[in-house]
Protein backbone atom coordinates (compact mmCIF):
# COMPACT_ATOMS: atom_id res chain seq x y z
CA UNK A 1 0.00 0.00 0.00
CA UNK A 2 1.30 3.44 -0.93
CA UNK A 3 2.37 5.77 1.87
CA UNK A 4 0.26 8.85 2.62
CA UNK A 5 2.21 12.06 3.22
CA UNK A 6 1.15 15.16 5.17
CA UNK A 7 0.64 18.25 2.99
CA UNK A 8 1.69 21.54 4.60
CA UNK A 9 2.31 25.18 3.79
CA UNK A 10 5.69 26.90 4.16
CA UNK A 11 5.06 27.29 7.91
CA UNK A 12 4.23 23.60 8.49
CA UNK A 13 0.47 24.17 8.80
CA UNK A 14 -1.36 20.99 7.77
CA UNK A 15 -3.37 21.42 4.56
CA UNK A 16 -4.33 17.80 3.88
CA UNK A 17 -2.92 14.47 2.75
CA UNK A 18 -1.79 12.89 -0.52
CA UNK A 19 -0.21 9.68 -1.80
CA UNK A 20 3.59 9.72 -1.92
CA UNK A 21 3.60 9.38 -5.73
CA UNK A 22 1.50 12.55 -6.17
CA UNK A 23 3.78 14.49 -3.82
CA UNK A 24 6.85 13.57 -5.89
CA UNK A 25 5.53 13.87 -9.48
CA UNK A 26 5.83 16.97 -11.68
CA UNK A 27 6.01 19.98 -9.37
CA UNK A 28 4.77 17.80 -6.53
CA UNK A 29 2.91 18.99 -3.48
CA UNK A 30 4.59 20.60 -0.48
CA UNK A 31 4.75 17.99 2.28
CA UNK A 32 6.43 17.30 5.61
CA UNK A 33 9.88 15.79 5.56
CA UNK A 34 12.94 15.71 7.76
CA UNK A 35 16.68 15.20 7.59
CA UNK A 36 18.66 13.86 10.54
CA UNK A 37 22.10 15.13 11.54
CA UNK A 38 23.57 12.45 13.78
CA UNK A 39 26.74 13.60 15.54
CA UNK A 40 29.32 12.05 17.86
CA UNK A 41 31.59 13.24 20.69
CA UNK A 42 34.39 13.95 18.21
CA UNK A 43 32.26 16.65 16.56
CA UNK A 44 31.67 14.54 13.45
CA UNK A 45 28.39 14.04 11.60
CA UNK A 46 27.26 10.86 9.90
CA UNK A 47 26.88 10.98 6.11
CA UNK A 48 25.34 8.28 3.95
CA UNK A 49 25.48 7.70 0.20
CA UNK A 50 21.82 7.34 -0.78
CA UNK A 51 20.36 4.34 -2.57
CA UNK A 52 16.89 5.62 -3.56
CA UNK A 53 14.71 6.22 -6.61
CA UNK A 54 15.29 9.99 -6.36
CA UNK A 55 18.78 11.51 -6.10
CA UNK A 56 20.49 8.14 -5.77
CA UNK A 57 24.25 7.82 -5.18
CA UNK A 58 24.52 11.31 -3.65
CA UNK A 59 25.67 12.14 -0.15
CA UNK A 60 22.99 12.80 2.46
CA UNK A 61 23.04 13.39 6.19
CA UNK A 62 22.39 10.35 8.42
CA UNK A 63 18.79 9.88 7.32
CA UNK A 64 15.88 11.54 5.58
CA UNK A 65 12.23 10.61 5.25
CA UNK A 66 8.67 11.80 5.85
CA UNK A 67 6.26 11.73 8.78
CA UNK A 68 3.38 9.56 7.57
CA UNK A 69 -0.41 9.61 7.85
CA UNK A 70 -1.62 6.15 8.84
CA UNK A 71 -4.88 4.82 10.32
CA UNK A 72 -6.22 8.33 10.84
CA UNK A 73 -3.16 9.56 12.75
CA UNK A 74 -0.24 11.80 11.85
CA UNK A 75 3.17 10.48 12.77
CA UNK A 76 5.19 13.10 14.69
CA UNK A 77 8.61 14.23 13.52
CA UNK A 78 10.15 12.39 16.48
CA UNK A 79 8.31 9.13 15.74
CA UNK A 80 9.23 9.32 12.06
CA UNK A 81 12.89 10.11 12.80
CA UNK A 82 13.13 7.17 15.22
CA UNK A 83 11.62 4.90 12.53
CA UNK A 84 14.13 6.22 10.00
CA UNK A 85 17.16 5.57 12.24
CA UNK A 86 15.91 2.04 12.94
CA UNK A 87 15.24 1.30 9.25
CA UNK A 88 18.41 2.86 7.83
CA UNK A 89 21.01 2.01 10.51
CA UNK A 90 19.30 -0.36 12.96
CA UNK A 91 19.69 2.27 15.70
CA UNK A 92 17.18 2.55 18.55
CA UNK A 93 16.79 4.75 21.59
CA UNK A 94 18.64 7.80 20.28
CA UNK A 95 17.40 11.08 21.74
CA UNK A 96 16.37 13.12 18.69
CA UNK A 97 15.15 16.72 18.60
CA UNK A 98 14.04 19.21 16.00
CA UNK A 99 16.19 22.36 15.86
CA UNK A 100 14.85 24.12 12.77
CA UNK A 101 13.26 23.76 9.34
CA UNK A 102 13.52 25.00 5.76
CA UNK A 103 11.54 24.77 2.52
CA UNK A 104 12.92 23.66 -0.82
CA UNK A 105 12.02 22.34 -4.27
CA UNK A 106 14.37 19.97 -6.09
CA UNK A 107 13.33 18.59 -9.51
CA UNK A 108 14.80 15.47 -11.08
CA UNK A 109 13.36 14.57 -14.48
CA UNK A 110 9.59 14.15 -14.13
CA UNK A 111 9.86 13.73 -10.36
CA UNK A 112 10.77 16.07 -7.52
CA UNK A 113 11.10 16.81 -3.86
CA UNK A 114 8.86 19.67 -2.66
CA UNK A 115 9.29 19.76 1.08
CA UNK A 116 8.99 21.58 4.35
CA UNK A 117 12.00 19.85 5.89
CA UNK A 118 12.70 19.71 9.63
CA UNK A 119 16.31 19.44 10.75
CA UNK A 120 16.49 16.83 13.49
CA UNK A 121 19.64 16.14 15.50
CA UNK A 122 20.83 13.39 17.79
CA UNK A 123 24.06 12.24 19.41
CA UNK A 124 25.41 8.73 18.90
CA UNK A 125 28.85 7.31 19.74
CA UNK A 126 28.32 3.64 18.98
CA UNK A 127 29.02 1.45 15.97
CA UNK A 128 27.11 2.10 12.78
CA UNK A 129 26.04 -0.31 10.07
CA UNK A 130 24.05 1.06 7.13
CA UNK A 131 21.14 -0.90 5.68
CA UNK A 132 22.37 -1.91 2.19
CA UNK A 133 18.81 -1.57 0.84
CA UNK A 134 18.87 2.21 1.38
CA UNK A 135 22.55 3.21 1.40
CA UNK A 136 25.63 2.42 -0.67
CA UNK A 137 27.81 3.35 2.28
CA UNK A 138 28.48 5.88 5.01
CA UNK A 139 31.24 7.88 6.66
CA UNK A 140 31.81 10.18 9.59
CA UNK A 141 33.13 13.66 8.75
CA UNK A 142 33.56 16.88 10.67
CA UNK A 143 30.94 19.54 10.06
CA UNK A 144 33.74 21.83 8.84
CA UNK A 145 34.92 19.22 6.28
CA UNK A 146 31.33 18.57 5.19
CA UNK A 147 30.60 22.26 4.65
CA UNK A 148 33.86 22.67 2.70
CA UNK A 149 33.00 19.67 0.52
CA UNK A 150 29.50 21.07 -0.08
CA UNK A 151 31.10 24.34 -1.26
CA UNK A 152 33.56 22.50 -3.54
CA UNK A 153 31.20 19.88 -4.93
CA UNK A 154 27.57 20.82 -4.21
CA UNK A 155 26.21 18.43 -6.86
CA UNK A 156 27.57 15.45 -4.88
CA UNK A 157 25.11 16.18 -2.03
CA UNK A 158 21.32 16.12 -2.05
CA UNK A 159 19.81 19.58 -1.69
CA UNK A 160 18.30 18.92 1.74
CA UNK A 161 21.69 17.78 3.09
CA UNK A 162 23.28 21.00 1.82
CA UNK A 163 20.53 23.13 3.37
CA UNK A 164 20.48 21.07 6.58
CA UNK A 165 24.25 21.32 7.08
CA UNK A 166 24.13 25.09 6.54
CA UNK A 167 21.26 25.43 9.03
CA UNK A 168 23.17 23.27 11.53
CA UNK A 169 26.24 25.52 11.17
CA UNK A 170 24.14 28.54 12.26
CA UNK A 171 22.61 26.76 15.26
CA UNK A 172 24.36 26.72 18.65
CA UNK A 173 24.85 22.95 18.31
CA UNK A 174 26.66 23.42 14.99
CA UNK A 175 28.92 26.04 16.55
CA UNK A 176 29.66 23.59 19.37
CA UNK A 177 30.46 20.82 16.86
CA UNK A 178 32.82 23.12 14.97
CA UNK A 179 34.52 24.09 18.23
CA UNK A 180 34.75 20.44 19.40
CA UNK A 181 36.45 19.42 16.16
CA UNK A 182 38.91 22.32 16.43
CA UNK A 183 39.73 21.40 20.05
CA UNK A 184 40.36 17.76 19.09
CA UNK A 185 42.66 18.82 16.23
CA UNK A 186 44.60 21.18 18.48
CA UNK A 187 45.01 18.46 21.14
CA UNK A 188 46.27 15.96 18.56
CA UNK A 189 48.92 18.43 17.36
CA UNK A 190 50.46 18.84 20.83
Model-derived features with residue positions:
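Surface-exposed, flexible loop/turn segments at secondary-structure boundaries
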Residues: 13, 44, 53, 104, ...
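Conserved Nudix-box catalytic region and its N-terminal flanking loop in Nudix hydrolases
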Residues: 22-34, 44-83
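Acidic, metal-coordinating catalytic segment for phosphate/diphosphate chemistry
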Residues: 1-35, 39-42, 50
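Nudix hydrolase/Nudix homology domain
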Residues: 55-59, 63-64, 69, 100-103, ...
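Sequence-level motif detector for i,i+2 pairs with an aromatic at +2
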Residues: 2-3, 10-13, 42-43, 56, ...
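Active-site segment of metal-dependent pyrophosphate-handling enzymes
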Residues: 42, 50, 77, 86-127
Amino acid sequence: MEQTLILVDNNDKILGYAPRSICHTGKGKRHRAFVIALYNSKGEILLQRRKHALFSNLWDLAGASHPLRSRGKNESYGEAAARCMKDEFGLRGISLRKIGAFNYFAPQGKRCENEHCALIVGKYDGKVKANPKVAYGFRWASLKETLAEIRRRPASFVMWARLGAKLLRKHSLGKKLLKTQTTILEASQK
